[in-house]
Amino acid sequence: MEKKINFAMNLLAQMTIRTIAKRSGADPLEVIADFMESDTAKILYDKETGLWENGPDYIANEYEQEKALKAS
C-alpha cells in the first residue's frame, strides 16, 4: 500500500504543477522548484495529512492560497 500512496503523491505533484503552470501561464519547469519547496508540497508528501487524497485542482488552490498569504 505504501508504494501506491507514494505513486499517488508523485502523480498528484506532477498534475498540480501542470495545473499551476496552466493557470499562471508559466513554464512548468519554472513551477517545479517553487512548488516542491512550498509548504503545500511538504503537506502533500506527508501521508498523515491526507492532502494526497484530493485532486490536483484542490492542491493547486492550496498552493495559491499559501503564495497569497506569503505575499501579503
Residue ranges: model-predicted function:
Residues 1-72:
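C-terminal alpha-helical interaction appendages
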